[in-house]
Amino acid sequence: MEKNNEVINSIQEVSLEELDQIIGAGKNGVFKTISHECHLNTWAFLATCCS
């Protein structure tokens, strides 16, 4: 029961804007990450260039 209270308290500390971004309901529904900005070919090259 104590863990449930901790979870509820943690959720209450998150602002509505942060929650929208986390669940993907923000401006365009996308949570920006470094891989979102880059092309797959770039990552494939980096993963295989040193093998």
From Swiss-Prot:
Protein family (similarity comment): Belongs to the type A lantibiotic family.
Question: Renumbered to this chain, where is the cross-link Lanthionine (Ser-Cys)?
Answer: 35-49
UniProt's post-translational modification comment states: Maturation of lantibiotics involves the enzymatic conversion of Thr, and Ser into dehydrated AA and the formation of thioether bonds with cysteine. This is followed by membrane translocation and cleavage of the modified precursor.
Q: Which residues carry this modification: 2,3-didehydrobutyrine?
A: 48
State the superkingdom.
Bacteria
Q: What is this protein called?
A: Lantibiotic streptococcin A-FF22
The cross-link described as Beta-methyllanthionine (Thr-Cys) comes at 33-38, 42-50
Q: Which residues form the signal peptide?
A: none
Quote the Pfam families the UniProt record gives.
L_biotic_typeA (PF04604)
Cellular compartments per GO CC: cell surface; extracellular region
Q: What subcellular compartments does it reside in? A: Secreted; Cell surface
A Gene Ontology biological process term: defense response to bacterium
What does the UniProt record say this protein does?
Lanthionine-containing peptide antibiotic (lantibiotic) active on certain Gram-positive bacteria. The bactericidal activity of lantibiotics is based on depolarization of energized bacterial cytoplasmic membranes, initiated by the formation of aqueous transmembrane pores.
Propeptide residue ranges?
1-25
* Sample GO molecular function, one term: signaling receptor binding
Q: What is its main location?
A: secreted
